[in-house]
């Protein structure tokens, strides 16, 4: 049998996505994270459960292409990113956006 290579969960989950759309999904127990592009759904689920101590019910991922930007010296490209939309079980919450509201 093949062995699942366990990586450090903090290397898989890079940052939460802070946007209006991600704030709107908080009421549905759905959170959005920027993840390592090589991570799969199983690794993302295990990492979220280990870091935040919640039960994950589903993981959806999307690959986003980096935009091409022109500069004075030529053309550059922003890096490609991968996002994970994670739904946690009813009653579980992840407090990543807590703090004073401006």
From Swiss-Prot:
Domain of life: Bacteria
Keyword ATP-binding recorded: no
Sorted UniProt keywords: Ribonucleoprotein, Ribosomal protein, RNA-binding, rRNA-binding
Molecular function terms from GO: rRNA binding; structural constituent of ribosome
One cellular component (GO) term of this entry: ribosome
GO biological processes: translation
Family: Belongs to the universal ribosomal protein uL23 family.
Function in brief: One of the early assembly proteins it binds 23S rRNA. One of the proteins that surrounds the polypeptide exit tunnel on the outside of the ribosome. Forms the main docking site for trigger factor binding to the ribosome.
Quaternary structure (record): Part of the 50S ribosomal subunit. Contacts protein L29, and trigger factor when it is bound to the ribosome.
Entry protein name: Large ribosomal subunit protein uL23
Species the sequence originates in: Cutibacterium acnes (strain DSM 16379 / KPA171202)
Gene, per the UniProt record: rplW
